[in-house]
């Protein structure tokens, strides 16, 4: 994917002036960043966007903070195992395009091949019992052996054991984060996150530097389910 397209999406999400579901709706209707950017301003006015939003959508925003953050993300993506996957990219998961609010761009750290596998979502409580965590670990191993890639949220409890079950069976796993790609939460999962980078991928839709705001976690769940052909919520007991 060319850097101009990535830069366009990065400026949009960094500005926080246009909700991601609205960006997604535009992409579903017009097909690409290029098609959206080339629409006449009057079309955006008819759709109810204000002047600042129209400037962003037309690619003419001059907001320095947004531009600087976007440039830092491009620099991040120039390093080994770091990727920016835009909506138009061949590496963008096809199932994720089908949801109403698919992210316009994904930050990926690890293996791109893991994005296009057959995923199964395995999630649950952070405050799970030993029994619940044991079940999550076992189910992750069995599903992995059956050819499915476990997708979860890197949280404590069930999510962590699901990732560990997949990794310990020698298979890849995908972790969808509720922070920027450059910040692991909880911090106690840094070693697990590194294992996932080496045998799967960390994924985030959020701008770099985004802290673990509580609202981020329900929001990222749509990506976990959107990536998967099926899902299972493991009870904490």
How should these model regions be labeled?
Residues 1-88:
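Short, small/acidic-rich helices and loops at N termini and domain boundaries
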Residues 1-5, 84-237:
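Glycine-biased, small-residue-rich flexible motifs in mid-sequence functional cores and linkers
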């Amino acid at each position: 994917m060319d850097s101009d397209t990535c830069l366009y999406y990065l400026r949009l999400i960094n500005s926080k002036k246009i909700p991601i579901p609205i960006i997604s709706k535009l992409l579903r209707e017009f097909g690409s960043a290029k098609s959206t950017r080339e629409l006449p301003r009057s079309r955006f006015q008819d759709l109810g966007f204000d002047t600042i939003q129209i400037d962003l959508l037309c690619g003419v925003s001059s907001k320095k903070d947004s531009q600087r953050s976007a440039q830092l993300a491009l620099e991040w993506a120039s390093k080994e195992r770091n990727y920016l996957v835009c909506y138009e990219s061949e590496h963008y998961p096809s199932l994720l395009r089908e949801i109403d609010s698919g992210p316009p761009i994904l930050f990926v750290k690890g293996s791109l091949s893991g994005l296009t596998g057959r995923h199964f979502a395995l999630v649950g409580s952070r405050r799970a019992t030993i029994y619940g965590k044991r079940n999550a670990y076992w189910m992750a191993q069995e599903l992995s052996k059956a050819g499915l890639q476990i997708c979860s949220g890197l949280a404590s409890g069930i999510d962590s054991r699901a990732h560990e079950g997949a990794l310990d069976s020698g298979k890849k796993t995908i972790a969808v984060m509720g922070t920027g790609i450059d910040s692991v939460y909880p911090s106690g999962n840094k070693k697990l996150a590194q294992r996932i980078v080496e045998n799967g991928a960390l994924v985030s839709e959020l701008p770099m530097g985004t802290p673990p705001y509580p609202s981020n976690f329900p929001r990222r769940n749509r990506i976990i389910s959107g990536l998967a052909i099926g899902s299972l919520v493991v009870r904490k007991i």
